[in-house]
């Protein structure tokens, strides 16, 4: 895959987010076709990971997208395959270390600067995607970062 093709996938992830999809959906859908996964099904599978998993502000949805894509790329399919499982875990840990280095945290609440359990877990209602939302949230940049990290992984394979 060329650099240009990978750049287009990174941009597709950002475009997905700007169209209203969650962080995880945006990242996974940008690469899902590489694994024979229909984009609609990819968005459904990734839907609950938005807002730091169900808007609980836990692991960043964009980061969860990296994890899901690594599973599609190199996840083991036999329960007894410890070597395959370990290889997948190594890739996840390496890519998430890069994400943490770039973004300061893997945790949605920390990335958003939300302090306190009650404030971070106050509602299951998705935020309205207004101009103010996009202006004040770092999420599009985090989606871009996650997609770029995964694209670079694919390039280096």
In which residue ranges do the predicted regions lie?
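Acidic-glycine-rich active-site phosphate/pyrophosphate-binding loop
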Residues: 2-4, 30-48, 118-123
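Long, hydrophobic N-terminal alpha-helical segment
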Residues: 15-19, 26-37
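Short cysteine clusters
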Residues: 23, 60, 108
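Amphipathic alpha-helical interface segments
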Residues: 29-33, 69-70, 80-157
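Transmembrane alpha-helix interface/packing and boundary motifs in multi-pass membrane proteins
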Residues: 49-56
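DPxDG-like acidic metal-binding loop motif
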Residues: 65-75
